């Protein structure tokens, strides 16, 4: 299965928000033009590293920086041999949790930690709806929940995400607007993309219900794996991930480790 960044849907999304996308042999190459300097060329979790194509595009778009986030340690070693260096600041999560969705709903629930089970059972009557057709309301609740503390995507970006992924996107939110999350699906994998919870939602543990609903819905539309899109990684310590990690680990699953971000400058 391909990473979501290598799907046609994701390519369509980035092309709508200011990136140039070249797609060759089912690999997405993302180009961001920078005035006066040239451009940045980014390749994220490709099935293989096609260095001849990368060189061709770097020359075509006058790339002063090439960023590659490989899938395997073998690909990472290959990049190092070509002069790429491991960045201390990864773009994509380098460590994540995944759940096997080919299991039954009952088996998935059984593998949850005690606190997750308890929160989900207590929240059985919480109203959760897909706000895909009211993104302004969804974003408004998100903005109100986090204030200036965290980045909230522009409404146009959320609309582009919906347009690109169509029925493979979910914008779930509780009826009281205290918690919500975006879930995306691509090539058999469902992703816990972005989320928000206000103080009331945290006190009621409503994000547990949101995630559980998201898991069930992406499973229903055919996803075989659920990806939490990042947990704390000791190799690239970022304390802001610790709280999210405790929450995500309460859903069980298994860890998946990625090599990191490799960069080469051509200035």
Stretches with model-predicted labels:
Residues 1-37, 82-202, 217:
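A conserved beta-strand-loop-helix scaffold within acyl/acetyltransferase catalytic domains
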């Amino acid at each position: 299965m391909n990473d979501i960044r290598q799907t046609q849907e994701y390519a369509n999304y980035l092309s709508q928000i200011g990136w140039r996308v070249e797609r060759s042999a089912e690999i997405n190459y993302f180009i961001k033009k920078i005035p006066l300097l040239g451009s940045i060329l980014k390749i994220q979790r490709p099935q293989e590293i096609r260095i001849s194509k990368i060189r061709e595009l770097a020359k075509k778009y006058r790339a002063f920086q090439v960023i590659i986030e490989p899938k395997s340690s073998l690909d990472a070693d290959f990049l190092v041999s070509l002069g790429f260096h491991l960045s201390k600041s990864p773009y994509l999560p380098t460590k994540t949790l995944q759940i096997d969705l080919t299991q039954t709903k009952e088996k998935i629930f059984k593998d949850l930690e005690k606190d997750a089970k308890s929160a989900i059972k207590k929240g059985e009557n919480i109203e959760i709806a897909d706000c895909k057709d009211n993104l302004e309301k969804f974003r408004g609740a998100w903005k109100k929940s986090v204030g200036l503390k965290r980045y909230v995507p522009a409404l146009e970006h959320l609309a582009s995400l919906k347009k690109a992924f169509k029925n493979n996107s979910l914008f779930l939110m509780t009826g009281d607007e205290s918690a919500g999350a975006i879930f995306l699906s691509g090539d058999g994998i469902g992703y816990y993309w972005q989320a928000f919870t206000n103080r009331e939602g945290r006190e009621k543990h409503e994000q547990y219900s949101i995630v559980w609903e998201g898991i069930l819905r992406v499973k229903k539309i055919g996803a075989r794996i659920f990806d939490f899109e990042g947990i704390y990684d000791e190799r690239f310590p970022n304390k802001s991930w610790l709280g999210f990690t405790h929450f995500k680990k309460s859903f069980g699953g298994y860890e998946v480790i990625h090599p990191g971000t490799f960069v080469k400058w051509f200035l």
